[in-house]
Structure formats: structure tokens, C-alpha cells
């Protein structure tokens, strides 16, 4: 089956140079009514035919023949799966003449004699482009010329801020220490201030007056402790006043 299909595809290959695409046949002949896959000429682009068109067409035709041979009843889902595994994208061709963006360089494919009969547009899925730079190494591997990197810490980025904070903290501590020392000195000076010395004569006079007053009070208390009647108390009230009168000027002179 594969030999018949490959021979049929080679017989339909155009002899003109530059096109590099398979010509469409009117349909399968009466002798071989099996699955057939033919490719239409690629759509013309503004830049002209691509150099790798012939190789891509051959590759697609081989993939289609392989899918037909492996699957007894080839379906559209099976055909798409086989082509996607090889890195191609498959879309059914619509009635529009212009191909959408990204499918301008697609190869036209015609499949007949199976459940997946129809016209399809097949193109290679482009790999995502990477920005120019160093090639990434595999995880867990390091370049031989590099030394083992130390664990990075986020504190290095905050060095200027941390330096300013340290300086401000030191200034604050110095000011606090200076204030504490000044307060301690003020307390010491307050405690060590000498009291104003009084003259010795005034002190002696005050002490003598205080002792005399204490003695007079003691005598008065002793006299009061003796039991007396009401008349005696009235009589003794006058001499008490007479006794207390001479003491008042003595207290005034002491003050």
C-alpha cells in the first residue's frame, strides 16, 4: 500500500524547477481506490517561494502516508494528532483566498478516500525565540571557572539606609548620656549646698529660751495634776495669768 502511494506521489511531482510542490490530481484512479493524500502548490507569498519548501512538502507527505498506513480508518482527529506530534499544525482550509497571519507559508494538503477527506493547510509550528544572551545552564550545574557563590542577603541593598540609621542612633545616645550626666551633677550640687550658718549667740539664745519654756510647761503640768475644787480653780486662774505674763516678752525676744 505504501509503495503504491509513494509511486503515485512521485509520478505527480512537477518537473518545473522552483515550485517545489506537488500537483493536485483529479482523483484516485479506478484501479487504486484506497486512501490517497496529495498536496497542492503552496500559496504564493510576497517574498517568493521559500528555499525549504520542497523538503517540508516531502516531510508532510511522508507523515500523511505513515498515518494512513497505521490507521485503518483515518479520521481527522488522528491525522491532526500525528502531524502535531511531528511539530506541525493542521487547519481545514476555508473558502477565503487570503490566509490568516502566521499561515502564509503553509503547505496545502488534500486528503481523499477516507473520513478525513478535504483540503487542509499545514505549517510548521515556530519555536519561541529567545532574547540574545547567555545560554541557560541546567539546574544544579555551575560553570567550572566560577567560584561557589555565597548566599546573598537582602541587607546589602540597604547599606546606605542602615549607615544613616546607625549615625542617628549614635547621636541620640550621646545626647541622652550628656543629659543624664547633667541631671546627676545638678542633683549632687543641690545636696552638697551648705546651709547659711547662724551666729553662735543667736543659737545659744534660742536653746536657752527653748529649755526655759519646756521647764515652765513641766511645772504647770505638775500643778494641774493636783486635785482641786471648783473655787480653788477660779482663784488659781488669776495667779496663772500673772505668772504667764512675764514669759510672753521673753518669747518675743527669742523670735
Curated annotation (Swiss-Prot):
Methyltransferase among keywords: no
Query: Where, subcellularly, is it found?
Result: Nucleus; Chromosome
What does the entry give for GO biological process?
A: chromosome condensation; negative regulation of DNA recombination; sperm DNA condensation; spermatid nucleus elongation
> In what tissue types does this protein appear?
Testis-specific.
Q: Where is the composition biased (Low complexity)?
A: 142-152
The UniProt record lists the keyword rRNA processing = no
Q: Which GO terms describe its cellular component?
A: chromatin; nucleus
Q: Which residues carry this modification: Phosphoserine?
A: 56
GO molecular function terms listed in the Swiss-Prot or TrEMBL record: ATP binding; double-stranded DNA binding; nucleosomal DNA binding
Give the record's keywords alphabetically: ATP-binding, Chromosome, Developmental protein, Differentiation, DNA condensation, DNA-binding, Nucleotide-binding, Nucleus, Phosphoprotein, Spermatogenesis
Main localization (coarse): nucleus
Which cysteine pairs make disulfide bonds?
none
Compositionally biased residues, Basic and acidic residues: 195-230, 238-248
- Sequence ranges of Basic residues compositional bias: 124-134, 153-166, 174-194
- Where are the residues of the annotated region Disordered? 1-54, 124-255
Q: Give the family this protein belongs to, as stated in its UniProt record.
A: Belongs to the histone H1/H5 family.
Its annotated function is as follows:
Essential for normal spermatogenesis and male fertility. Required for proper cell restructuring and DNA condensation during the elongation phase of spermiogenesis. Involved in the histone-protamine transition of sperm chromatin and the subsequent production of functional sperm. Binds both double-stranded and single-stranded DNA, ATP and protamine-1.
**Which protein are we looking at?**
Testis-specific H1 histone
Please give the organism: Homo sapiens
The lineage is: Eukaryota, Metazoa, Chordata, Craniata, Vertebrata
Amino acid at each position: 500500500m505504501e509503495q503504491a502511494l509513494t509511486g503515485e506521489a512521485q509520478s505527480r511531482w512537477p518537473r518545473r524547477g522552483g515550485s517545489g510542490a506537488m500537483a493536485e490530481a483529479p482523483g484516485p484512479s479506478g484501479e487504486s481506490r484506497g486512501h490517497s493524500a496529495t498536496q497542492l502548490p503552496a500559496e504564493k507569498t510576497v517574498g517568493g517561494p521559500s528555499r525549504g519548501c520542497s523538503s517540508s512538502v516531502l516531510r508532510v507527505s511522508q507523515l500523511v502516508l505513515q498515518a494512513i498506513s497505521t490507521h485503518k480508518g483515518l479520521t481527522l482527529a488522528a491525522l491532526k494528532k500525528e502531524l502535531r506530534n511531528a511539530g506541525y499544525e493542521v487547519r481545514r482550509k476555508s473558502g477565503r483566498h487570503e490566509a490568516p497571519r502566521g499561515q502564509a507559508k503553509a503547505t496545502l494538503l488534500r486528503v481523499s478516500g477516507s473520513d478525513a477527506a478535504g483540503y487542509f493547510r499545514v505549517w510548521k509550528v515556530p519555536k519561541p525565540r529567545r532574547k540574545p544572551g547567555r545560554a541557560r545552564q541546567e539546574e544544579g550545574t555551575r560553570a567550572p571557572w566560577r567560584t561557589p557563590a555565597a548566599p546573598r542577603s537582602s541587607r546589602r541593598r540597604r547599606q546606605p539606609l542602615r549607615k544613616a540609621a546607625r549615625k542617628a542612633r549614635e547621636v541620640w545616645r550621646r545626647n541622652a548620656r550628656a543629659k543624664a550626666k547633667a541631671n546627676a551633677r545638678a542633683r549632687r550640687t543641690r545636696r552638697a549646698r551648705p546651709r547659711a550658718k547662724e551666729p553662735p549667740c543667736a543659737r545659744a539664745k534660742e536653746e536657752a529660751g527653748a529649755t526655759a519654756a519646756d521647764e515652765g510647761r513641766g511645772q504647770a503640768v505638775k500643778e494641774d495634776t493636783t486635785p482641786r475644787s471648783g473655787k480653788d480653780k477660779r482663784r488659781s486662774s488669776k495667779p496663772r495669768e500673772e505668772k504667764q505674763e512675764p514669759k510672753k516678752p521673753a518669747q518675743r525676744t527669742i523670735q
